[in-house]
From Swiss-Prot:
This is Sodium/proline symporter. The lineage of its organism: Bacteria, Bacillati, Bacillota, Bacilli, Bacillales. The gene is putP. It is found in: Cell membrane. The keyword Cell membrane applies. GO terms for molecular function: L-proline transmembrane transporter activity; proline:sodium symporter activity; sodium ion binding. Induction: Up-regulated by high osmotic environment, such as increasing concentrations of NaCl, and low L-proline concentrations. It catalyses: L-proline(in) + Na(+)(in) = L-proline(out) + Na(+)(out).
Length: 512
């Protein structure tokens, strides 16, 4: 999910106890990174994918934490505070999309990526699945990942820097460097194992925060009567359909389509120890997501009553959680809640860094060095993976150095870009024997292009007809599906091995 992109302008008071809690949080992340480093054996698959040995509970919470980012704690409560319950449509779409993802994509992807040459990245899976000897598909999909995730990562660094600036009154660049250093440390040294464990730890912090803040806020207001007060202030605050047209509802609901093609999320399914563990992961993951999102909605709704009751001037709705955590709680607890925001931001940054590093190493460096070198020089490739983490982070920091850079405006569309270009391709690759390399390349590129064209030239026409304001993932997804299918039908069919592999994957997934 998208990280915060807007400025956090509401400064709150912080004392030494708050700083101590943040320091303890950072120390725990460093220890986990060191633990991941000590567990490493110099194997590339282990560094990038945890050796496919991750349990269901870490899988579930790491997928959730890397997905939600600062949006769940900052963006969603701010949106509900500003518009009321109608903002909840996006949470319904996301929860449904994530739930379907666990059923439709997760089991087959876990089995198929191992069967198809033990692929450790999505582009590598596409290459092996479609016998792409020229590596065209691998290079194009790898480039999409590297470019978009570098921008994604930059957005996370901006959010971290602005959090320290707004919550502590510290210099933006100091906060940026501090967040970057901690994330780079545990990702660089600990690899996938450290990232997954820290995501689990951060997921727990995020969940506690999203349950604690609205409950304490209600206790300090009017209990369950707080929602009655919110409705009395403005009846439409609790109206799920307020201010939304059919197009608006569909646009919010369609965010769920993006899940099937988000590399930093579906890589979690590839790393789980066995596909048979996915039901456990699904139950915990979806429960975590539902409770967390409902908590975020509750923060926004209680905030509508909280702000006037405490005579607070809220300059930026996205700072609502920060303000409530500092006003309602002891500084030590307030520090814990600020750590929850950092957890949300940093869990996404680390996941995106590692996916980008994996792509640079597996999808590009391996092409230069060759398959045989990759098998016999594993430590070299692990070192290249670590250096890739550092390089991508430095580029993202450089872009984030100017937080007002216009590139930030593009990051909000990356979810749609991945969803339109990768989601249909992943589904076709897992279920349809007729998919061809030409169809895959055409569908992926057309989906991405439609998203770009829709954002640049179609959406500005929304004032003429609201259909033009449709969320860009919908036209992008539809065009990608059509182009992939039509081009695959018109081009040379894949070999018989594809049907054999698909049947084998289906049979393994059905095993109890």
């Amino acid at each position: 999910m998208l990280t915060m992109g807007t400025a956090l302008s509401q400064q709150v008071d912080a004392n030494w106890q708050t700083y101590i809690m943040i320091a303890v949080y950072f120390l725990i992340l460093i220890v986990i990174g060191f633990y991941g480093y000590k567990q490493a054996t110099g194997n590339l698959s282990e560094y990038m994918l945890g050796g496919r040995s991750i349990g269901p509970y870490i899988t579930a919470l790491s997928a959730g934490a890397s997905d939600m980012s600062g949006w769940m704690i900052m963006g969603l409560p701010g949106s509900v505070y500003s518009t009321g319950l109608s903002a909840m449509w996006i949470t319904i779409g996301l929860t449904l999309g994530a739930y379907i993802n666990y059923f439709v994509v997760a089991p087959r992807l876990r089995v198929y990526t191992e069967l198809a040459g033990d692929a450790i990245t999505l582009p590598d899976f596409f290459k092996n699945r479609l016998n792409d000897k020229n590596n065209v598909l691998k290079i194009i999909s790898g480039l999409i990942i590297v470019v978009f995730f570098t921008l994604y990562t930059h957005s996370g660094f901006v959010s971290g820097g602005k959090l320290f600036e707004s919550a502590f009154g510290l210099d933006y660049h100091f906060g940026l460097i501090l967040v970057a250093f901690i994330v780079i440390f545990y990702t660089f040294f600990g690899g996938y194992l450290a990232v997954s464990i820290t995501d689990f730890f951060q997921g727990v912090i995020m969940l506690i925060a999203m349950v604690m803040v609205p409950i304490v806020a209600m206790m300090n207001l009017n209990g369950w009567g707080t929602f009655h007060d919110v409705a009395a202030m403005k009846p439409t605050n609790l109206n799920l359909f307020k201010g939304l047209s059919f197009i608006g509802i569909i646009s919010l609901f369609s965010w769920g389509l993006g899940y099937f093609g988000q590399p930093h999320i579906i890589v979690r399914f590839m790393s789980i120890k066995s596909h048979k563990m996915l039901p456990k992961a699904r139950r915990l993951g979806i429960s975590w997501m539902a409770v967390g999102l409902l908590g975020a909605v509750a923060v926004g709704l209680t905030g509508i009553a909280f702000v006037p009751a405490y005579h607070i001037k809220l300059e930026d709705p996205e700072t609502l959680f920060i303000v409530m955590s500092q006003v309602l709680f002891h500084p030590l607890v307030g520090g814990f809640l600020l750590a929850a925001i950092l957890a949300a931001i940093m869990s996404t940054i680390s996941s995106q860094l590692l996916v980008t590093s994996s792509s640079l190493t597996e999808d590009f460096y391996k092409l230069i060095r060759g398959e045989e070198k990759a098998k016999t020089h594993q430590k070299e490739f692990v070192m290249i993976g670590r250096l890739s983490v550092l390089v991508v982070a430095i580029v993202a920091i450089a872009i984030a150095w100017n937080p007002n850079d216009t590139i930030l405006n593009l990051v909000g569309n990356a979810w749609a870009g991945f969803g339109a270009s990768f989601s249909p391709l992943v589904l076709f690759a897992l279920y349809w024997k007729g998919l061809t390399r030409a169809g895959a390349v055409s569908g992926m590129v057309s989906g991405a292009l439609v998203v770009i064209v829709w954002i640049a030239w179609i959406k500005p026409l929304a004032h003429i007809n609201e259909i033009f304001g449709l969320y860009e993932i919908i036209p992008g997804f539809i065009v990608s599906v059509i182009v992939t299918y039509v081009v695959s039908k018109l081009t040379k069919k894949p070999g018989a091995f594809v049907e054999t592999d698909l049947n084998k994957v289906r049979d393994i997934v059905r095993e109890k």
